Amino acid sequence: MTVTVEAPVKSVEAVNLQEVQEEAKGKGKQAKKGKSRSKSKPQIQEPVSTETAVPETAVPETAVPEVAVPETSSHEEAPTQQQSRSKRKKADQKQIALKIICSSDVLGQTLAIACRAIAGRPSHPVLANVLVQADVESQSVKLTGFDLSLGIEATFSAQVEAGGKICLPAKLLNDIVSKLPSGEVTLWCSSKESEGDETLGEKLSCGLEYASGQVSFSGISPEEFPSLPKVDGRAVYLPSETLLEGLRGTLFATSTDETKQVLTGVHVTLERDEVEFASTDGHRLAVVKATTSSAVEDEYTESSGSHEEPTEVTIPGKALYLVEHLLKSLPTSSRRIEESEGEEEHQSSVVEVRFEPGQLIFRMDNYQINTRTLEGQYPNIHQLIPKQFLREVTVERRSFLSAMERIAILADSKNNVVKFSIDPTEQMITAFVEAANVGSGKEAIPVDISGESLDIAFNIKYVIDALKSLSSSDAILHINRNNTPAIFTPIGGETQKLVLLMPIQIRD
């Protein structure tokens, strides 16, 4: 019996496995599982002997692998799954969504400008954020603020180690950066995977590292941040000096009354060889005209040779105050303009202004400002301006302005009235202010008077604003009567300027 068992065991090793599997297909469920788990099963089933001991031995041997298989499988697979999950979690936590290194001063200046488009009470939570976009290829960072009416894109150079985009809380970030010491800072954002969510980037942990410390805060996905409107209409290129002078000469006269929406902006008229800026609040009017050949360069009229119809648009004062700020404090954009011979080129400092119905953009240096335009018919300002005057008072602008600022301290805070007494005999103008229960003030200023004597009153704040808007050394006050508009104009200068003031009626 012993010999009979050993001989088949040795022969089983030479048996083809495929033949053994084919013979085992017709057997029971336990025999089928045993074949796939253990090599001993073919050794037991191979002998085709009449001995009944062989199948009796196969049953317990088949049961052994059934118990062993699940124990071995659970023991080997469990650590593998835990390690995989752990590695994936660590990888997600270390996933860098954005990382930049830059100067704290540059970041602070650029961020402060972008935040000027952030509304105090945004209509949507995402609008309380500034969109940060970092580009590895250009090594630049773009900050965007948008309140659905005014949008600002501000770009600066930085060392970008990881590109991407994220929305960060504008006020919080601006407050932090404004307090940082000068030096290098690192801004980074790390993506985290939400529980049970395979999409990275929905939860973002961010930090700002500087020489003496670090801060951490949260960002949100940029997907909901609205895109700034694209404006592809007519484009003109204004010399930066012309645009700045036009804004300086008109912005002060815009209305602050939101019920008169169209008067809260500056009305701009663009023609082939002229640009006009105008503003009024109903009590005063300011107009600036630039009529030199370099005032407007139009890409369409230059290419076609045709004369475009004048473009008229009313631009919100909020957007223009920002443009003025950038023009005064930052270098404006430069655009190459070819000479007529095509041989030489020179740099001309210009600002691109592009129009579409309801929208326009300003592009200068590293900044782009998007703004909606104001709807409504702007008043016909030219019919309000007198053509002739009976009296002219020529003043030294700075000394006259200083006198007005001194006596304005004692003017009545309710109406700010200053009374002018014009004396052509003495060639003197006397300014008088009075405030009940406070005091009074008087200044006598030597001037050059043409015409008869007259007493007239104005809002002294309007007089001061008018004198500040004129950049010349001397100015002329044009007057007809004490109940008709008076006008301040500069003497000299390349642009035409005027400020119209309505007199205040006084009782003797």
Walk through the language-model features, giving the residues of each.
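Structural preference for solvent-exposed beta-strand-turn elements
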Residues: 2-33, 39-508
